[in-house]
């Protein structure tokens, strides 16, 4: 009887265990701005994970208008609340459009990455590009932020998250800044190889069970 009770307790605990979390931590490119959030790329990512047999749940903690400084300020709370196995980091576009110093952007992204890893989470970095409003020197320095961080911290990354979207008017909203609903599948395809590789790496290391 004691063995049976112990077994039932273990089975009950396993049944109540929450699936590992994939945390999307971004800005309006990921928040579902201007569309039904159920058709945003993070929502499509959840569908993709289910289709491919992953047990992970996707939590979208993206905020429209968010900067890297804002993200760095709230990452601790997000990590405590959701205990993610994987953080998909998509920030920096608002910083670049406002001409914030690339060094500051890099420091903020580094903080988010390092804090996520310190909590045991893997990280995927989604690279952003901006129009050359501030000249070629600033534009290059901004783009180098993602490349350099990926190399320095050995972070899986996507060089240009908005590839095949940013210059296609049919996939952009009227403001020519935000992707529309039709673009979400393209964004998912851009990010998916890095996300899948990160999930497989976490499974090998055993961290996906968190």
What are the roles of these predicted feature ranges?
Residues 16-64, 74-83:
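Serine-esterase "nucleophile elbow" of acetyl-processing enzymes
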Residues 44, 54, 70-210:
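Alpha-helical cap/lid subdomain in secreted, periplasmic
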Residues 65-69:
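Acidic-and-aromatic substrate-binding clefts and catalytic sites of carbohydrate-active enzymes
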Residues 12-14:
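N-terminal signal peptide c-region/cleavage motif recognized by signal peptidases
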Residues 1-3:
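Positively charged n-region of N-terminal signal peptides that target proteins for export
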